[in-house]
């Protein structure tokens, strides 16, 4: 039973017309019911806030003396209905709209100390999560070293070479070997070939499959020797695509050749690091346009079609002067100098190992490294290599001699005046006033320097 009173009792009111709430008289329940059934006296509309009479205390009534009527609390004041804000159509600026109902879009607030989760590339396995090299550049570095080790002359535009490059890149992506392990694997590859009795012929030559298989075995041994996290041969079989029994046979053969001794105190790690940095810088350099070759100056009065055999001896030595008519080095040496390769000496890089040289190899084995003249530029070689730029073939010389004997001699150009000044070079200048007696040129042909 509720302990409340009603504002408007059904039976009583004072002289002013205001309702008076009094407790029901004590009596039987029947009298209370009869009183409750009497019709209320109409007192008119009286607002609830005008009630000034203090309600009696409920403490003296007790549990059973409470009135039968129920007290109803006044209704809560109605709140003013506010229409939800209307968002502007897309494309309108919020500052130009004066509508108070328009609110700017919500801005995500970041609490202090709360940082956005950074998105990072997920690395699935591998030795190193963060590599200290670019996989594409390192793959080219490995490929070129493998070709030098096997004395293989493969073109970089060849489809087979492209597959070899993609195979190395795939293995590096799967295993994520550190650079130290890769350099050790390249060192193992050179040592293994040097230890073979018949060189590359002992293992079947230098086909692209043999180069790829032995390069992968070098990776396997370097990983097992140098890294804390190693892979099983089954994992290497899945990464390289080589059958596991082939990997096992190659590994046993390599270990027998090395006499089970993979540690070498003469491993020149810092030399590999330096060479890789040079290689990377050359890979990142923009391609430089090759200068246009100048036409050789021949007899002006002779209008015959003379065929020249232009035979540059180096891809980067396009403007080497003719022998005995040497031009002083007025240009930067990294553009027009001739590289010199000595077959009887090795650099410090191979002095300890004694079997290979990275940058100072013989001419037949360095078809690739000729594109770095600024690394090993030197004066023109006087050894077994020919650096003449304009050369006649023997057949062309015979044809020209026959034709020249039938035609009258053409007028001879006067030689240019050259001061007899000596330059600090081992060959020096030879005056053009002297009689030209070069075995490869006829008396009416004057070779001039290609550098102006």
Curated annotation (Swiss-Prot):
InterPro entries: Cyclin_PHO80-like. One of its GO terms (cellular component) is nucleus. Keywords: Cyclin. Gene3D superfamilies: Cyclin-like. The keyword Ubl conjugation does not apply. Belongs to the cyclin family. PCL1,2 subfamily. Forms a cyclin-CDK complex with PHO85. PANTHER family: PHO85 CYCLIN CLG1, PTHR15615. Cyclin partner of the cyclin-dependent kinase (CDK) PHO85. Has a role in cell integrity and polarized cell growth together with the other PCL1/PCL2 cyclin family members. This is PHO85 cyclin CLG1. It comes from Saccharomyces cerevisiae (strain ATCC 204508 / S288c). The lineage of its organism: Eukaryota, Fungi, Dikarya, Ascomycota, Saccharomycotina.
């Amino acid at each position: 039973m509720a302990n409340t009173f009603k504002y408007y009792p059904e039976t009583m009111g004072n002289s002013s017309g205001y309702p008076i709430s009094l407790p029901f008289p004590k009596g039987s329940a029947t009298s209370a019911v009869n009183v409750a059934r009497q019709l209320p006296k109409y007192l008119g509309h009286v607002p609830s806030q005008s009630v000034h009479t203090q309600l009696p205390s409920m403490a003296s009534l007790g549990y059973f003396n409470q009135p039968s009527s129920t007290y109803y609390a006044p209704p809560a004041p109605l709140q003013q209905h506010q229409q939800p804000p209307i968002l502007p159509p897309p494309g309108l600026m919020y500052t130009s709209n004066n509508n108070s109902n328009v609110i700017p879009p919500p801005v995500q607030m970041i609490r202090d100390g709360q940082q956005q989760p950074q998105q990072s590339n997920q690395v699935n396995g591998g030795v190193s999560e963060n590599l200290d090299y670019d996989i594409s550049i390192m793959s080219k570095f490995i490929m070129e070293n493998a070709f030098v080790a096997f004395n293989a002359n493969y073109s970089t535009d060849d489809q087979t070479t492209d597959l070899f490059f993609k195979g190395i890149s795939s293995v590096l992506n799967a295993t994520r070997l550190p650079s130290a392990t890769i350099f050790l694997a390249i060192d193992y590859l050179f040592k293994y070939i040097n230890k073979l009795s018949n060189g590359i012929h002992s293992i079947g030559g230098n086909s692209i499959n043999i180069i790829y298989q032995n390069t992968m075995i070098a990776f396997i041994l370097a990983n097992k020797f140098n890294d804390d996290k190693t892979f099983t041969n089954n994992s290497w079989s899945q990464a390289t695509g080589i059958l596991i029994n082939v990997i096992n046979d190659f590994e046993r053969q390599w270990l027998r050749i090395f006499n089970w001794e993979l540690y070498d105190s003469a491993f020149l790690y810092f030399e590999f690091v330096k060479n890789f940095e040079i290689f990377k810088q050359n890979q990142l350099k923009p391609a430089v346009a090759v200068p246009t070759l100048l036409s050789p100056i021949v007899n002006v009065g002779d209008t015959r079609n003379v065929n020249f055999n232009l035979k540059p001896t180096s891809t980067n030595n396009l403007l080497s002067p003719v022998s005995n008519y040497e031009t002083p080095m007025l240009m930067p040496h990294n553009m027009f100098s001739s590289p010199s390769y000595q077959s009887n000496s090795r650099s410090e890089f191979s002095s300890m190992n004694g079997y290979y040289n990275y940058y100072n190899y013989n001419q037949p084995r360095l078809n690739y490294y000729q594109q770095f003249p600024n690394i090993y530029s030197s004066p023109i070689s006087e050894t077994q290599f020919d650096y003449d730029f304009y050369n006649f073939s023997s057949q062309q010389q015979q044809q020209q001699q026959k034709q020249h004997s039938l035609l009258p001699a053409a007028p001879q150009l006067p030689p240019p005046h050259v001061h007899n000044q000596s330059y600090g070079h081992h060959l020096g200048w030879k005056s053009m006033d002297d009689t030209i007696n070069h075995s490869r040129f006829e008396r009416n042909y004057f070779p001039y320097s290609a550098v102006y």
